[in-house]
Amino acid sequence: KALCNFRRYDSKGEHETTELLPDDNLIIKGNNLLALYSLRQRFRGKVKLIYIDPPYYFHKPKPSDTFSYNSNFHLSTWLVFMKDRLRIARDLLSENGVILCHIKEDAIHWLKVLMEEIFYADNFVETFIWKNTDNPDSLSNKSRSSVEYIICFEKKKNASIAYKGKKTENGDAPLLNSGNNEHELIFPAGCIKFNIPDGLYPAGKPDRVTLLNDIEVKNGLNINNVRLKGEFKWSQTLLNEEVNLGTYFVVKTNKFSIRFQRPQGTIMAPEKFIEDQYLSKAIGVGSNEDASTHLKNMGIDFTNSKPESVVAFFVRAMTEERDIVLDFFIGSGTTAAVSHKMNRQYIAVDQMDYIETETIKRMNLVIQGEQGGISQALKWTPQNSDLLDGDKYAHNSFVYCELAQANQQLVDEIMA
């Protein structure tokens, strides 16, 4: 009842609709604070990722900003503006949900303190740093800033949940680490590959590792269990788990500085300084200039948009397919476009008129298979939107709606 004027968009065009399915993608026009309250009953505790790029606070007046909002806030006004929205947004997050907020230097410390108040300091994860431009401002004779910050909090921090960053190369790595406590590890027969001659190697201390029993090597493998003592990274339990997963070990010299090698590369956590390559060698995490070129090629009239690749970096790291992603400062629609291409359900909100022209136009191009941004790296190929189940790209549609007039009238009266 809080929303009205529903229109569904799919590969066949625009259609009026009165039905809203549980997994529909939503684009909502209206005051985002009221929209968040309107969404709370249905989506409380269901959103996996909130990704926002709000209007920034600046120390000095700016002629405009990304979203055509008034960016010349007094600090206190801006903080109240953000606090009201972050408090209700927290209710929408799932218990393992994550919120990311872009910000520049002017207000990063104020925003961090505000988010600690709302999400609690213990749930802070990281302030990621992204190089947002290849052409930093040259007006200052003190420094040339070329980065933005993305503050990350979890609703309830969970050490067992790992974010996905870049994949490591499938090379061997040392099992020894200087400074670790010395302890014994037992390596099962056949799990160590030796690059030294076959034969019998007596117990002793050739270097940093102590051989606690005699070792017999045949055809490049240990034919008996090997007991070693050293400053190892792993416990016996972890070693046993790794062996069961196919990990093997390598001894390259008579010093017996043992190394491990997994059968395939592993996924590391994202780094604080965002890597410029992660999707592919051709398409990495780009800059605002990349976003401008992409939008221009689509005929979208919008300035200061984020590239799809930086949004995709976090969507990939922190969500799985069909998780819900929320952006209540949608702007040109980058978060929605990325979520659509990566098969996440999304809710996008904005109050500006460009949502009906630029944002909807962009999302229609995505539905038709637009190949800019991250499309080629992901091999984005949308399928027939009539297939609502059982297909990876079956959710190739979105529903546009507006805040009901009674709610919007209240906003208009307050702003008058």
Which positions does each model-derived feature cover?
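Short, well-ordered loop/turn and helix-capping segments at boundaries between secondary-structure elements
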Residues: 116-121, 130, 155-159, 341, ...
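Short, glycine/acidic-enriched loop or turn micro-motifs at the edges of active sites
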Residues: 34, 56, 330, 353, ...
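Conserved S-adenosyl-L-methionine
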Residues: 71, 75-79, 108, 308-384
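S-adenosyl-L-methionine
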Residues: 17-38, 364-406
